[in-house]
Amino acid sequence: MVALAVALGVGRFAFTPLLPLMLQSGSIDIRHGGWLASFNYAGYFIGAITCAALRVDHARMVRVALAITAALTVVMGVTDAFWIWALVRFVGGAISAWAFVFASQWGLRRLAELGAHRWSGVIYTGPGVGIVGTGLLVSAAGGLGAKLGWIGFGLISAALAALVWHVFEAAPRRVAPASPAVAAEHSEAVAVGHDRPGSHTRPSGRTAPPARSSASTHHARPDRTIHRADAIWLVVLYGVPGFGYIITATFLPVIARAALPGSPWPDLFWPMFGVALMAGALLAARLPLHWDNRMLLAGAYVLQAAGIASGIVWPTAAGFSIGSMLIGLPFTAITLFAMREARRLHGEHAAGLMGYATAAYGIGQIAGPLVAAPVAAHTGSFSPALWLAAFALMLGAAGLLIVTRVSKRRSHR
């Protein structure tokens, strides 16, 4: 949890509460702020898809990631050169992706060894803890400016890394390659305690060979066709929330300060997002496994769309508070539901599918700030970009409902 709080909560998301201070100091404008955000998300995308090529000890990689995250965070506060910021944010994004994957796998393995599967959800509250911490610290000490904020977060990250350094001891086992998809599958299996019915997997995690009959062979081809179509739509529609949530996740304090000038509330909306994220991480894995994942995804998209709309049509403290929680609550749940759907479609071979889906999500994240920042700079408001994000989420939800209906109709033929 601490590792993810540092790598993601600070390394990836501390930019959000500090961006208003950077804008206020004149060291950056909103357009370049959008570029910095997209550089970070591009780095995360590259880091995520290169994890499979890294054959390193998980614990050692987490240590390296924590140390680099702390150092890069300090660098953000000691220079004003945009090209250095861009490089730091890009590299920091890749490091945070590696930290997420390797820390997840290390933590889940340790919990399995200790027989403490029920605590797996706590690992994924880490980003929320980091978001809450950075948001509250900026709210309390924002007057010190962005530079000291970056340096302070870097020093705090270094202290937290030192605190857990001894925990990440190198494992004597053979190190297997890691990927976000494999980590995702592992986390989903551990979080729920058993596999989905029909996956041909025993609760112990060992694969049981499915019995094949002439009937199953006869229906194999149409089943594969249906699953292939569903898999394609999963990849396409999983990219939607990447675009949908990221505009708010990047610019929420900026948007709130513009709507509520002089109010102390804008600095608190980001921590509210973090609290909701933690709650969602703990609750999502406890939902019944027999519920349709695509319907759950559609519901999560609608929640995030409603959260975005709340801040636009009701630009008050209450509206932004509700919006922050509605966007944060399904943040982790969306990933979990997509993992489960990938496992339903491809069983033990879901890693490739989840990798493609993760790539689509990453592309959405990169595109969000690149669209929002120029629109805001041109119109003087984020509302058009936010409405576009909300519309995209609703369109994605509608697409999931249609795919679900068509898939069920085909399977009953």
Model-derived features with residue positions:
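Helix-loop-helix hairpin linking two adjacent transmembrane segments in secondary transporters
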Residues: 122-175
